[in-house]
């Protein structure tokens, strides 16, 4: 086994971080657990083999809400017992009467007791209702990022890798799972003890175990690139058939990744488990991957968006088995090495298995726009964000670490070439397997393979906050002048905020003899650059072909008109990615004051017959974004914007129809459902009538009345236009179903209501146990999109803040989500002071980033309204929407 000795990202960072003392280092853990799912308590014993690095009479390790019964330390022929055990700052400090000499191997034995948590962190319980209506419980784990310390005493830092041997004793009717395969199971007096094989060298945050009544489906890897091994999807009884898609895809994906990475999957099995209560979307525990129900279960009739989402999540988690598990970031400031790469790899793999889905087209409107949106705020953060305290870690599980991180990977892979990139990744994995790395290790491998200085060119992309807008103008000498400056959504960049120069691949697309050509190697590495082009190119140039660069492009109004017409007259010139990216850039830049919003509206009107789903959906999203930002403005302008969105969406909805045919492909199913939802919500008579009819039939028991692709849209439209009857019917649907997708559709739809009475009833659901804690934010998402919802939600949240927080786990990202949805819906700067006033006496350290990002979003929206309201009004009047 090749092992890389962990290194620090920075000695200064380690000095300032709240890390454990370095006098001892764990080598191996023997962990025994005895959970009781009736009392929700458990006993345990951990025996840790330690490498003693310094003379020591004190040992400090992590632990939260664990009661240590005794503490024995053995080395050589000596055994001593702790003279003092103290707790605090998420640590357990053990004092011993004797000193263990450096260079010893010692064994620490700690029996302990604890409660099985209810908070979706550490070792916790999850509930479900079985087919007989009985509430059942299972016990599972969520260790990432720093909750292993909630489950057992340990050294809970990613660089402190060790091996683990686990045995668990529980009632014999339970299935017991852990990272490795069970090598022995014994039953005595109604109790079953499962002992698992020793793990690979791994970080504590990847450890997992589950005790539950489960059933499973099983597939085997093809055996082409890794040994033939079982891949199982476990579910609570009655759901295993819905795990077939994920199990089969998982088996193929493990083999595929083994080939791509040049490193066979090292474990003898891979289990994937659907957990009823789960704070995140999924968790990549090595060999025992856990998921929300809605991230892994699908049926033959599931909506296209659901199937694609499950495929993406499964492949994301399995990519982690290499990027994150086999090779792990040194510390959490390198989280992007895990999440950015796994995100990119999931799209890479999805494109391999389902090329007809054309996922790289939607990547531009999904990951790229998510990254650009968050990173345009002053309160964004670098991809490699300094982390000094553990409570900061959960706040960087966001679109910067995931989406921007993956966009950096995509940008590099496009520039050096995919084959070269993959070979560099293989070198990186081979060199650092079972070890820890920093970003420079990745760049070194890619530099060695490509022959280019990747480390220098990519430095600012991971170390600095933000990204540039590239402004293009034409000189009198027939040249293109390209300048870069930092982009902020408020459009008010200060000189001191505009000091970073980014390396930006220009990917300049031009017309040559009527055909598209792309300069793949042109880059901007200074503040500005001039490029000589011919006359034909001057009429047709488009930067950032395929949107592979992480920046926006600002064209003159005249050139934007030329590009919009070229797209109509020569539809093959601008790719789907180009067109979607152009819409996104123009809309975002005009919101920030680079040009007029009327330019966005003109472009969308010109492309109203756009045939591609990704481009059309981006157009609708941008129109709806403008309308939504105007939620507190006059009823006249809101009505006019609604009329515009209705015209664009309804025309396409009627053109495509909303009956689903057997030969409808994956993309057309998404297209039909998207435009149906928009047309219905914005009041198309035929769509509303159809949706209400379908909903009544469904609520009366005819579950086949709604195609799965339309279910969310029908629920939304019914709540918007069906009144009290529909709201009550939807609540009954929610309480009676155990289908996670139906339940999620219900929760999102509740917030669509603009009726104040039913908004209040919807808000009351957030405190009602019938809504799982993991799902509270789903209600708030849609409430935050309309005026009545924003106002009522703020009043409710500020009146019930402690109750609301008590339903949200301390660890994880849920508190940040809730804060963001409760606060970010305001659109005038006057709201900022009242939000600050409310939170002034609150401990906001667990959601400080989310709060600041909300305030920045409000500032950006307020600035947008101040700059653009007159322009929008004029355009709507000139085009007869007002």
Curated annotation (Swiss-Prot):
Active site, renumbered: 317
Disulfide bonds: none
GO biological process, any: proteolysis
Alphabetical keyword list: Aminopeptidase, Hydrolase, Metal-binding, Metalloprotease, Protease, Zinc
Site (described: Transition state stabilizer): 402
UniProt key word Transcription: no
Protein name: Aminopeptidase 1
Lineage of origin: Eukaryota, Fungi, Dikarya, Ascomycota, Taphrinomycotina
Gene assigned in the entry: ape1
């Amino acid at each position: 086994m090749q092992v890389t000795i962990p290194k620090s990202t920075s000695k200064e960072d380690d000095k300032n971080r709240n890390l454990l003392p370095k006098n001892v280092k764990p080598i191996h853990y023997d962990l025994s657990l005895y959970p009781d799912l009736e009392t929700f308590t458990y006993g345990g014993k951990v025996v840790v083999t330690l490498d003693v690095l310094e003379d020591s009479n004190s040992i400090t390790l992590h632990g939260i809400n664990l009661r240590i019964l005794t503490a024995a330390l053995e080395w050589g022929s000596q055994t001593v017992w702790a003279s003092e055990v103290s707790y605090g700052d998420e640590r357990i400090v053990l004092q011993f009467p004797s000193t263990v000499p450096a260079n010893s191997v010692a064994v620490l034995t700690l029996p302990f007791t604890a409660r099985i948590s209810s908070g979706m962190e550490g070792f916790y319980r999850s509930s479900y209702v079985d087919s007989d209506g009985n509430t059942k419980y299972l016990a599972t784990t969520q260790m990432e990022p720093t909750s292993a310390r909630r489950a057992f005493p340990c050294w809970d830092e990613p660089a402190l890798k060790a091996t683990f041997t686990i045995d668990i004793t529980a009632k014999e009717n339970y299935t017991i799972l852990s990272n490795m395969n069970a090598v022995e199971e014994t039953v005595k007096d109604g109790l079953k003890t499962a002992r698992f094989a020793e793990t690979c060298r791994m970080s504590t945050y990847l450890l997992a175990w589950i005790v539950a009544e489960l059933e499973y489906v099983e597939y085997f890897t093809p055996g082409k690139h890794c040994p033939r091994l079982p891949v199982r999807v476990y579910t609570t009884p009655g759901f295993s058939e819905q795990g077939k898609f994920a199990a089969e895809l998982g088996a193929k994906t493990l083999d595929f990744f083994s080939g791509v990475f040049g490193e066979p999957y090292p474990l003898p099995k891979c289990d994937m488990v659907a957990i009823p209560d789960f704070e995140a979307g999924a968790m990549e525990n090595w060999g025992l991957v856990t998921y929300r129900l809605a991230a892994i279960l699908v049926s033959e009739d599931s909506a296209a968006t659901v199937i694609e989402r499950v495929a993406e999540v499964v492949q994301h988690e399995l990519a982690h088995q290499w990027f994150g598990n086999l090779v792990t970031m040194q510390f959490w400031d390198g989280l992007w090495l895990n999440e950015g790469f796994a995100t990119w790899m999931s799209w890479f793999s999805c494109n391999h298995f389902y090329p007809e889905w054309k996922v790289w087209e939607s990547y531009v409107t999904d990951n790229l726009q998510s990254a650009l949106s968050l990173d345009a705020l002053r309160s964004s953060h670098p991809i490699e964000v300094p982390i000094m305290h553990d409570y900061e870690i959960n706040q960087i599980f966001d679109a910067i670490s995931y989406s921007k991180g993956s966009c950096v990977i995509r940008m590099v892979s496009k520039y050096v070439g995919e084959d070269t990139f993959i070979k560099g990744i293989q070198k990186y994995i081979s060199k650092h397997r079972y070890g820890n790395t920093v970003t420079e290790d990745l760049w070194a491998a890619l530099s060695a393979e490509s022959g280019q200085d990747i480390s220098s060119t990519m430095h600012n992309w991971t170390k600095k906050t933000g990204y540039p807008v590239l402004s293009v103008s034409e000189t009198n000498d027939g040249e293109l002048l390209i300048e870069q400056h930092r982009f902020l959504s408020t459009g008010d960049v200060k000189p001191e905020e505009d000091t970073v120069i980014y390396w930006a691949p220009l990917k300049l697309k031009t017309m040559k003899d009527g055909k598209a050509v792309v300069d793949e190697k042109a880059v901007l590495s200074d503040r500005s650059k001039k490029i000589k082009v011919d006359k034909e190119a001057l009429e047709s140039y488009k930067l950032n072909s395929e949107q592979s660069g992480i920046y926006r492009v600002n064209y003159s109004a005249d050139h934007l008109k030329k590009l919009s017409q070229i797209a109509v007259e020569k539809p093959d010139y601008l790719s789907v990615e180009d067109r979607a990216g152009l819409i996104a850039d123009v809309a975002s830049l005009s919101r920030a004051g680079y040009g007029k919003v009327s330019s966005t509206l003109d472009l969308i009107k010109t492309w109203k017959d756009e045939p591609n789903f990704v481009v059309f959906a981006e157009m609708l999203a941008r129109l709806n974004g403008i309308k939504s930002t105007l939620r507190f403005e006059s009823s006249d302008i809101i009505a006019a914007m609604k009329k515009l969105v209705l015209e664009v969406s309804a025309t396409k909805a009627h053109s495509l129809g909303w009956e689903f045919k057997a030969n409808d492909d994956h993309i057309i199913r998404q297209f039909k459902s998207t435009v149906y939802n928009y047309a219905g919500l914005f009041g198309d008579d035929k769509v509303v009538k159809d949706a209400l009819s379908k909903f009544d039939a469904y609520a009366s028991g005819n579950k086949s009345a709604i195609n799965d692709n339309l279910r969310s849209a029908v629920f939304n439209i019914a709540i918007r236009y069906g009144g009290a009857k529909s709201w009550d019917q939807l609540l009954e649907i929610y309480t009676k179903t155990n289908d996670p997708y139906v339940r999620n559709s219900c929760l999102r739809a509740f917030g669509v209501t603009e009726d104040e009475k039913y908004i209040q009833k919807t808000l009351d659901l957030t405190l009602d146990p019938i809504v799982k804690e993991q799902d509270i934010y789903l209600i708030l998402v849609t409430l935050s999109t309309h005026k009545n919802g924003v106002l009522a939600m703020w009043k409710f949240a500020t009146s019930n803040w402690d109750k609301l927080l008590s339903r949200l786990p301390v660890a994880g990202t849920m508190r940040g989500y809730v804060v963001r949805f409760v606060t970010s819906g305001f659109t005038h700067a006057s709201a900022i002071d009242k939000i600050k006033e409310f939170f002034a006496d609150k401990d906001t350290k667990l959601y400080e980033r989310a709060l600041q990002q909300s305030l920045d979003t409000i500032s950006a929206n307020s600035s947008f309204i101040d700059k653009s309201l007159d322009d929008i009004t004029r355009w709507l009047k000139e085009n007869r929407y007002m």
